[in-house]
Amino acid sequence: MSGNTLGTLFTVTTFGESHGPAIGCVIDGCPPGMALTEADIQAELDRRKPGTSRHVTQRQEADEVEILSGVFEGVTTGTPIALLIRNTDQRSKDYGNIVETFRPGHADYTYWQKYGVRDYRGGGRSSARLTAPIVGAGAVAKKWLRERFGVEVRGYMSALGEIDVPFVDWSHVRENPFFAPNAAIVPELEAYMDALRKDGDSIGARIDVVASGVPVGWGEPVFDRLDADIAKAMMSINAVKGVEIGAGFDSVAQRGSVHGDELTPAGFVGNHAGGVLGGISTGQDITVSIAIKPTSSIRTPRRSITKDGQPATVETFGRHDPCVGIRATPIAESMLALVLIDHALRHRAQCGDVETQTPKIAGSAT
């Protein structure tokens, strides 16, 4: 089966291509009775849309969302919700030079070898443009999680290239185009990106996402563990090459006496597990980090081959993000929210009536 759908009970199926007439998604399984307007979704899309600063692609897309179904008189009906976002600023002529060649680092070669046909315009189906519908669906998931359980899903940039971004306060995240939680470091990030763009090169980034207020019990062992589904969803984001839950790869150097989060009547002591044990949420913050590779489209000539297997030199034109990580924060937030709402509904379906005598301890003992 083709892999265009995410989720089990709350499913999202995306459609469209970068330079097609429109992109969008169909959400199935959204509970009825939730107030929902296009403005609720647009607010999240505006955080991701291109052309918002000199540090991202200058493709000008309003990303205005249309709700085609599943909402009546401002309330979800429980039927499929179709979201449509029209493409308005395609410039396909910029890709005429790669009709017969493959861009290094892109999905051109693999899509061609798998399907025997590819839409070369802006990467077609493999373009990060297709993350817009994910953010639209994520807005629906975020709203339901917040209103039903008080769950908040927030993210920020924790590193841009070799520059670490120390966390100061959540209030800074919405005040700069990098989603940096530290206002003092923004000038350094801007200078770094200006120099990078002048060199015609690109760089990667690290994004951290935190879900707070998640109840204990979400997750379906053994093959649909909460952290496993989170990792899969995050790896589905374009350019993501690594995922960490909690301490992640730092766990390798930690002793068991350090890594194991002790339990006390007052709460957990530490959260190295990232809010998940045995594939089930603990009630602590769920913490996720993703590593995003440098953008493959750069101005430097690159070696490649033609469809006939002959050597070729590829020069990439078009409008591209020198760091796709700059706009990735709302995408990562949306992916986490989509996994959480799916598991919330799955838990309710099987274990909604389960009660134990053990009190639910706090996420932190401090």
Swiss-Prot record:
It is an enzyme of class 4 (lyase). One of its GO terms (biological process) is amino acid biosynthetic process. Pathway: Metabolic intermediate biosynthesis; chorismate biosynthesis; chorismate from D-erythrose 4-phosphate and phosphoenolpyruvate: step 7/7. It comes from the Bacteria. Its EC number is 4.2.3.5. Its cofactor is FMNH2. Keywords: Amino-acid biosynthesis, Aromatic amino acid biosynthesis, FAD, Flavoprotein, FMN, Lyase, NADP. NADP(+) binds at R48, R54. CDD domains: Chorismate_synthase. GO terms for molecular function: chorismate synthase activity; FMN binding. Reduced FMN (FMNH(2)). It catalyses: 5-O-(1-carboxyvinyl)-3-phosphoshikimate = chorismate + phosphate. GO terms for cellular component: cytosol. FMN binds at R125, S126, S127, N238, A239, G278, K293, P294, T295, S296, S297, R319. Belongs to the chorismate synthase family. Homotetramer. This reaction introduces a second double bond into the aromatic ring system. This is Chorismate synthase. The gene is aroC.
